[in-house]
From Swiss-Prot:
Record-level GO BP terms: mitochondrial electron transport, NADH to ubiquinone; response to xenobiotic stimulus
GO molecular function: NADH dehydrogenase (ubiquinone) activity
Organism: Rattus norvegicus
Function, as annotated: Accessory subunit of the mitochondrial membrane respiratory chain NADH dehydrogenase (Complex I), that is believed not to be involved in catalysis. Complex I functions in the transfer of electrons from NADH to the respiratory chain. The immediate electron acceptor for the enzyme is believed to be ubiquinone.
Pfam families (alphabetical): dNK
Protein name: NADH dehydrogenase [ubiquinone] 1 alpha subcomplex subunit 10, mitochondrial
Record bears the keyword Secreted: no
InterPro entries assigned: Deoxyribonucleoside_kinase, DNK_dom, NDUFA10, P-loop_NTPase
Record PTM: Phosphorylation at Ser-250 by PINK1 is required for the binding and/or reduction of the complex I substrate ubiquinone.
Length: 355
């Protein structure tokens, strides 16, 4: 599954949307634009990450259960601190940040469906783990985009969930009998290979909303698929957050926990963020050399996804060679997808031979 995403993503998937939605705020960051592709020569000529970092050059993630209010709080934090907001990565994250930005057919987007998961989480066609595997790869791409933006411009980023909290859904799926143990083993192997390559958030904000209130919000929202989510599944997500995620993250970054009504006061949350010491975690040990290595990784999206390709047979995410080749060839026939970004005349790219 990740191999399919690897083949369908250009090397610089974040280039198209790098500065989208970013704000220019005085004394907050050097620039919201990354004009040239970073490399060894740029580093030698003085493009050093440490020169761009300041007190607001942070990675902040907002976590919580379904319908816990993550989006609004994350947007408010980003706006008040002059950071860039990254909405939660979904199935179409890769297509939204590459090509013309339009959603692609399900065949090019993991062959999975969130609606189908809600309707029939125990479907025997493997949709549940295919969905989880694809979403992890999407979060990985987004996290690499966020780090690329921060290291290239100095502007802080605020994300809704991340690769560090994604596992809470896997644990809930397994506890509810939606996926097999082999799927859990495969997922954990991918985590083992990918997480060490990245730096964790500087701060995690968790919105603690009781399952009963979550269910009430879901019913009020009125999504016919989401309304089928059980309280047991939501409780397993909450348990994974509180028993595993928060204790682990508290060892390597700052953690703030708010109730649903406390999270509504974003000004108070921002004040708490500004009072944090940020005196633990691997960010303290970084220098221009380690930042250079990380920048080289996160700007190469094929390399980012390469870490997720584990050579193991798993029916839920395995497709045949002929089917894979057909999908790849069909993808390359789409507008703006045949060559690297900026080299496709069919979508209006100019001066191709001079690039």
């Amino acid at each position: 599954m990740a191999l399919r995403l690897l083949r369908l993503v250009p090397a610089s998937a974040s280039a198209r949307g790098l500065a989208a939605g970013a704000q220019r705020v005085g004394r907050i960051h050097t620039s919201v634009h990354c004009k040239l592709r970073y490399g060894l020569l740029a580093s030698i000529l003085g493009d050093k990450t440490t020169k761009k970092l300041h007190e607001y050059s942070r990675v902040i993630t907002v976590d919580g259960n379904i319908c816990s209010g993550k989006n609004k709080l994350a947007r408010d934090i980003a706006e008040q601190l002059g950071m860039k907001h990254y909405p939660e990565a979904g199935i179409q994250y890769s297509s939204s940040t590459t090509g013309d930005g339009r959603p692609l057919d399900i065949e090019f987007s993991g062959s999975c469906s969130l609606e189908k998961f809600y309707d029939n989480p125990k479907s025997n066609d493997g949709n549940s783990y295919r969905l989880q595997s694809w979403l992890y790869a999407s979060r990985l791409l987004q996290y690499s985009d966020a780090l690329e933006h921060l290291l290239s411009t100095g502007q802080g980023v605020v994300l809704e969930r991340s690769i560090y909290s994604d596992f809470v859904f896997l644990e809930a799926m397994y506890n509810q009998g939606f996926i097999r143990k082999q799927c859990v083993d495969h997922y954990n192997e991918i985590k083992r290979l990918t997480l060490p390559e990245y730096l964790p958030p500087h701060a995690v904000i968790y919105i603690d909303v009781p399952v009963s209130e979550i269910q009430s919000r879901i019913q009020k929202k009125g999504d016919p698929h989401e309304m089928k989510v059980t309280s047991a599944y939501l409780q397993d997500i909450e348990d994974a957050y509180k028993k595993t995620f928060l204790p682990k993250m508290s060892e390597i970054c700052e953690v703030l926990v708010y109730s649903s009504w406390e999270a509504e006061d974003s000004t108070k949350v921002v004040e708490d963020i500004e009072y944090l010491n940020y005196n633990k975690g691997p960010w303290l040990k970084q220098d221009d050399r380690t930042f250079h290595n990380l920048r080289m990784l996160v700007q190469d999206k094929r390399e980012v996804l390469n870490y997720t390709t584990v050579p193991v047979y798993l029916p839920e995410i395995t497709i045949g060679a002929h089917q894979g080749s057909r999908i790849y060839d069909s993808f390359r026939e789409l507008p703006g997808r045949k060559y690297a970004p900026g080299y496709n005349a069919d979508v209006g790219d100019k001066w191709i031979w001079l690039k």
